[in-house]
Amino acid sequence: LLEIVFENEDGQTATLTEWKNTKGMYIKTDEDLQKRDNAQFGRVCQILDCFYPQRPDAELSTFKEMIDWTKKMLDPMVATKKKLRLKVIYDKKGYTQVSKLGIFVEDMSNTDSQIKLFKNDLMERPVVADKENNDPLNVPPTVTPETADAAGASDLPF
């Protein structure tokens, strides 16, 4: 797991999380896996490009090596507190996340932003109606039929 946390002056954070790609439901072939790994490495390189004028060379063959290399490259940069422009969107549940589509981070010194909005990017928190749950403790009173006593008369006067 690779987690990169971005923080603004107000202490608000946005997180980019990268997981190890494995074959499964959505990644069926070696080619698909390589494509996903390349896209993932491209996102990491976007962040590094904000701090380094020339992208450092690296021979990485595993996800763990990529994590270690990324940490080694970014740790000294945290202290610089360099200002970055970041594309933060909402997910379907209304939580903020760093977008993974296209260019999502760049140096604030760039006057012409290359960050673009795509049709799938949610920029407003989705409004989701609350589900009405039945409270198991709030049970309506049950009506019991009137029972007659042995004489056939009820306690009630009428």
Which residues make up each language-model segment?
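Short beta-rich binding modules
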Residues: 1-158
